[in-house]
Regions:
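Conserved catalytic motifs of ABC-family nucleotide-binding domains
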Residues: 40
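Cleft-lining beta-strand/loop regions that shape enzyme active-site pockets
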Residues: 20-30, 44, 49-190
């Protein structure tokens, strides 16, 4: 989350990053179901300690990564009337910021190309796994932007080229349809 210090000394939520609840490192504690934190609210206490009593709110979170922590939120910069929630803070937010940057780029490319072009990010340390995470959901695109500006190098590129140069081994087409695809439109089980 992005916060700013209010003239009252309490800290205001300026931005809450969306997360991906399927990944422990990409979850966003203030955006998790049931938390209902809102931009504009004030973090007025952490584990009962008023945030206006410290210079740096983050000092109250030292050693609290992945530990249930009570946060008091209020629409006003005051303790009275605050509601208490329990979150498990992240150790770092870099992964969450990077995930949101990638999601924003996917949306921009999709919008600019009317859904015809996909976007695959720089594939950091997870390399081919990260490539697969973004490649396979975009198989139906006419083209791909593979953004490797921040890639540190290595042996991933030949593996990516191998995936990109594969020929379809089967095609599907419904009777009377003009649409041909490499993936089924539906699966019937049972």
């Amino acid at each position: 989350a992005e916060i700013s210090r209010d003239k009252s000394g309490f800290f205001r939520l300026e931005k809450i990053l969306p997360g991906a609840s399927w990944s422990k490192s990409l979850r966003s504690p203030l955006a998790e179901p049931g938390i209902e934190a809102k931009v504009g609210e004030f973090i007025v206490a952490i584990d009962g300690v008023p945030t206006n009593s410290v210079k740096d709110m983050y000092s109250l979170l030292v050693g609290k990564a992945d530990v249930p922590t009570e946060i008091s939120l209020n629409s006003k910069p005051q303790l009275e009337g605050a509601r208490k929630i329990v979150i498990s803070p992240l150790e770092e937010e870099y992964s969450l910021y990077h995930y949101n940057w990638v999601q924003d780029n996917i949306k921009k490319v999709d919008k600019a190309s009317n859904g015809k072009i996909g976007y695959i990010p720089d594939m950091g340390p997870e390399g081919l796994n990260e490539f697969s995470r973004y490649f396979y959901p975009q198989l139906d695109k006419e083209g791909l932007i593979i953004d490797d500006r921040a890639n540190g190098g290595g042996n991933v590129s030949p593996m990516i080229l191998e995936r990109l140069s594969r020929e379809p081994y089967r095609l599907t087409m419904r009777g009377g349809s003009v649409r041909i695809g490499t993936v089924p439109d539906a699966v019937q089980v049972g």
